[in-house]
């Protein structure tokens, strides 16, 4: 993985405590604390979540202060650690998607994040429900009109510097800036003000995966205490704010949140990633022939990268006389000269890069130079919703849909959405989720304490009973299965 953010930060000797030992509550204590947290979340009227690097480590992004964190290894002279996949392909974790569900149900009012990995926005959390205190490695902002641009590639700079792109607003056109802070940069006032306001309103601030060391952000959760609110902390290391918290849990964040969601009978939605390409075909007449140019580019501009594409195969299934080709260099472009009077079908196969949930997806493109295609713009949100429903129903990626097309004489351009990944978190074999059997007694029924804690109706627990029955048939004790 490219950890560009850590590499681009200016050098600083004092980064606080690093390499702190990890603490794990015993299974019994962890179970008890998860039950307590589930009650706190269920009873909360204004829940605010404060997140740090620890919620993203299960996606392959190293943290900063843990035993193998970025700053821990740098201090020992080992440099920036590697990771398991490209930064731009990092997938929201179980915790990210659980927060999306909590927001949809109305329980979660706001998220305050110190992370720059864009996983909260990538997960589907509404922008208006999120404050990114340290910026976003995939976001640019116009300093003039304040319009934000969320990209599918990592921005080249940090430190609120100019980027190569300009605002697309015809009445503006100002040079864009990155949004990621360097050490000496002040926190963005808009994000800070929103975060402070939400913490003051909160009756519960849940801190997830953060050491609560970076000021002034680390003091925000405590603002809830002034109005009678409470603070709960889930982290593998001790934090300076533990003594002020009503509940401190030492455990893996995904495991804790999976348990909370299960106890509240809430489903963790799948993560479905959709990427976009722009396809254009321009032509010029040369006697009885047509010279045409095909381009596959980013919707963010002709020079912007397409990080999710490794190559594009162009073939002509109905025309054996037309030679297929594999485009390997970005920007993807192909020039050909063909007869004006012979229409053909172009098959574009997009070969995806590492980290995608499938290897490729194909789009048919009918070409007839004697006919001008019509222009249209479809309802983007509706199309994406239908596309994601189809991906979830089929449990696989690769689906695609056209969002808009512009047809003019001698040219046509269209934008397509492609599902490039789908990850489920609610299956029994999910490594991060807590098996349902963990919360059952040896006879397969839910513990009375669990039902009392969440107001669960035993008649609605058919799935839990089926799981327990399967375990008994296999000769396993549901109460002793490994988490």
From Swiss-Prot:
SUPFAM superfamilies referenced in this protein's UniProt entry, alphabetically: DHS-like NAD/FAD-binding domain
Cofactor list: Zn(2+)
Q: What is its EC number?
A: 2.3.1.286
Q: Which residues form the active site?
A: 134
* Effect of gene knockout: Enhances histone H3K9 acetylation on transposable elements and promoters of hypersensitive response (HR)-related genes. This leads to increased HR-related gene expression, hydrogen peroxide production, DNA fragmentation, and programmed cell death.
Q: Which UniProt keywords apply?
A: Metal-binding, NAD, Nucleus, Transferase, Zinc
Q: Give the record's GO biological process terms.
A: ethylene-activated signaling pathway; negative regulation of transcription by RNA polymerase II
What does the UniProt function comment say about this protein?
NAD-dependent protein deacetylase. Has deacetylase activity towards histone H3K9Ac. May have a function in the safeguard against genome instability and DNA damage to ensure plant cell growth. May act as a repressor of leaf senescence by histone H3K9Ac deacetylation. May negatively regulate metabolic signal transduction involving methanol and jasmonates during leaf senescence. Required for histone H3K9Ac deacetylation and repression of AP2-1/RSR1 and amylase genes during early seed development.
Protein known as: NAD-dependent protein deacetylase SRT1
Species the sequence originates in: Oryza sativa subsp. japonica
Higher taxonomy: Eukaryota, Viridiplantae, Streptophyta, Embryophyta, Tracheophyta
Q: Which gene encodes it?
A: SRT1
